[in-house]
């Protein structure tokens, strides 16, 4: 998750710390090997960042993100390097947080909605 944290620091100036999510055993056993989940902290906010080990489609990402929100009770950010502009727009319309390192970050649960973008 260093790429995501570096991007948030270098682009937005957000100094976020993160460690592996301590409640990882709540993730379904068949999904556990395919997902990395860290618990991130920024100021007083605590949230999860999830990244799949393969390029998952948007419906799968949204389904897994929703289940992690339910399991953890925390906002959960999707990290995916290959989101197309229309996919990012769709996530924003649905207020689903995401990081597309080097392109855009959308974190609506923070005090402000941080985002930065470069055209595709």
What are these regions (language model features)?
Residues 1-96:
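DNA-contacting interfaces and partner/effector-binding or oligomerization modules
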């Amino acid at each position: 998750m260093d790429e995501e944290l570096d991007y948030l620091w270098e682009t937005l100036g957000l100094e976020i710390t993160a460690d592996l999510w301590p409640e990882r055993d709540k993730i379904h056993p068949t999904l556990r090997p395919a997902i990395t989940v860290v618990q991130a902290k920024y100021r007083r906010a605590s949230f999860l960042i999830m990244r799949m080990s393969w390029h998952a489609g948007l419906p799968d990402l949204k389904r897994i993100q929703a289940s992690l929100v339910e399991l953890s009770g925390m906002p959960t950010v999707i990290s995916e390097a290959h989101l197309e502009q229309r996919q990012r727009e769709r996530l924003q319309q649905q207020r689903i947080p995401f990081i597309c390192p080097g392109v855009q970050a959308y974190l609506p649960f923070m005090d402000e909605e941080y985002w930065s973008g470069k055209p595709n």
